[in-house]
């Protein structure tokens, strides 16, 4: 019998009074599936990788935000210069009188929407608070834990203000072109995406945007879109009874044979093999 790897508080928190800490991953290596006896917020700064959360794969890159409950199981694979930070916390140790339940999806149970995105503005402000939080949580001086918890509360509220669903920026958003491009790509799972049209609408240089995207994510635009679609296909193959031809259409592939070729190249298995193997987990 294979035992689930579990990360424990005693290995990450300085004392049983500490409620919050910061765990840097510069860069994040491949990490086997695991759970914790604490919760965490995960913010991705740059690079890319495959994050599998409760059997759902996400192709992650800059701006991705996850709320991870202690009971959630997750892993990292196929990482490429993936830089992220884990803000870890113990719900039962928090003393500040905030509506933690309302502010943090899945605060008390593994439920709610775990995956969100942050634009460049939110990321910049979050990075500043996390820097202060990291400093306070490593101090052995009076009121360090209280200061860290205050900063954690500020961070949680900031994330609430700036986060948005992966495929939908707020209509009044003033985020950067790169943020808008990643959102448009996430909204193009089922429909074709035309970069030239996007650049015409945004009055920007296609060449410059391609360079900026690759610099920040470590992928080309086409690679990212293809891998996001394959991740969605993996989820549908495991959790739905749709025909493979229908899944191909749902994931933006007009030809099911081409879908099978791409899927096999990205995962090392045909769609049928993937479905069979992963259906045994359910």
UniProtKB/Swiss-Prot annotation:
GO MF entry, a single one: DNA-binding transcription factor activity
Disulfide bond sites: none
Pfam families to which the protein is assigned, alphabetical: AraC_binding, HTH_18
Domain HTH araC/xylS-type: 179-277
Positions of the record's site feature: Interaction with sigma-70: 246
A Gene Ontology biological process term: rhamnose metabolic process
Regions annotated as coiled coil: none
DNA-binding interval(s): 196-217, 244-267
Location of the protein in the cell: Cytoplasm
Assigned keywords, A-Z: Activator, Cytoplasm, DNA-binding, Repeat, Rhamnose metabolism, Transcription, Transcription regulation
GO cellular component, one term: cytoplasm
UniProt cross-references to PROSITE patterns, sorted A to Z: HTH_ARAC_FAMILY_1, HTH_ARAC_FAMILY_2
InterPro entries: AraC-bd (IPR003313), Homeodomain-like_sf (IPR009057), HTH-like (IPR037923), HTH_AraC (IPR018060), HTH_AraC-typ_CS (IPR018062), RhaR_RhaS-like_N (IPR047220), RmlC-like_jellyroll (IPR014710), Tscrpt_act_RhaR (IPR023699)
Source domain of life: Bacteria
Function, as annotated: Activates expression of the rhaSR operon in response to L-rhamnose.
Subunit structure: Binds DNA as a dimer.
The protein's name in its UniProt record: HTH-type transcriptional activator RhaR
Species name: Shigella dysenteriae serotype 1 (strain Sd197)
Lineage of the organism: Bacteria, Pseudomonadati, Pseudomonadota, Gammaproteobacteria, Enterobacterales
Gene (name only): rhaR
């Amino acid at each position: 019998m294979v035992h689930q790897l579990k990360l424990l508080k005693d290995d990450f928190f300085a004392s049983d009074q500490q409620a919050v800490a910061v765990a840097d991953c510069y860069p994040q290596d491949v990490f086997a599936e695991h759970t914790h006896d604490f919760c965490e917020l995960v913010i991705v700064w740059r690079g890319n990788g495959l994050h599998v959360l409760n059997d759902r794969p996400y192709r992650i890159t800059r701006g991705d935000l996850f709320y991870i409950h202690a009971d959630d199981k997750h892993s990292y694979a196929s990482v490429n210069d993936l830089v992220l930070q884990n803000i870890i916390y113990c719900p039962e140790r928090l003393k500040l009188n905030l509506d933690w339940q309302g502010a943090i999806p899945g605060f008390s149970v593994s439920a709610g929407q775990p995956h969100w995105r942050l634009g460049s503005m939110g990321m910049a402000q979050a990075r500043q608070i996390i820097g202060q939080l990291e400093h306070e949580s490593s101090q052995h001086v009076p009121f360090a834990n209280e200061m860290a918890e205050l900063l954690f509360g500020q961070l949680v509220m900031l994330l609430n203000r700036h986060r948005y669903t992966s495929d939908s920026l707020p209509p009044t958003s003033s985020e950067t072109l790169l943020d808008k491009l990643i959102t448009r790509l996430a909204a193009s799972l089922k429909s074709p995406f035309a970069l030239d049209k996007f650049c015409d609408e945004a009055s920007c240089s296609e060449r410059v945007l391609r360079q900026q995207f690759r610099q920040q994510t470590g992928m080309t635009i086409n690679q990212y879109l293809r891998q996001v679609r394959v991740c969605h296909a993996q989820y549908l193959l495991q959790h739905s009874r749709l025909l493979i031809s229908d899944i191909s259409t749902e994931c933006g592939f007009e030809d099911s044979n081409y879908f099978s070729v791409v899927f096999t190249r990205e995962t090392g298995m045909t769609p049928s093999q993937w479905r069979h193997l992963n259906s045994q987990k359910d």
